[in-house]
């Protein structure tokens, strides 16, 4: 199963999946990507 959550530390619109993934990894998640019409950074990991 994959868990997803909005990044707590990512600021502004998400334009780069790479930047989002780096922020998520610093928060202890496996990675992340830009998602949805508002381009939020969503963190993902196995759970």
Swiss-Prot record:
Domain of life: Eukaryota
Originating species: Triticum aestivum (Wheat)
One GO biological process term: defense response
Protein task: Inhibits protein translation in cell-free systems.
Family membership: Belongs to the DEFL family.
UniProt protein name: Defensin-like protein 1
UniProt site positions, description: Interaction with trypsin: 11
CDD domains membership: Knot1
Gene3D superfamilies attached to this UniProt entry: Knottin, scorpion toxin-like
Disulfide bonds: 3-47, 14-34, 20-41, 24-43
Keywords: Antimicrobial, Disulfide bond, Fungicide, Plant defense
């Amino acid at each position: 199963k994959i868990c997803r959550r909005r990044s707590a530390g990512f600021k502004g619109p998400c334009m780069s999946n790479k930047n989002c993934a780096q922020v998520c990894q610093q928060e202890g998640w496996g990675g992340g990507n830009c998602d949805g019409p508002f381009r939020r950074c969503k963190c993902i990991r196995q759970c």
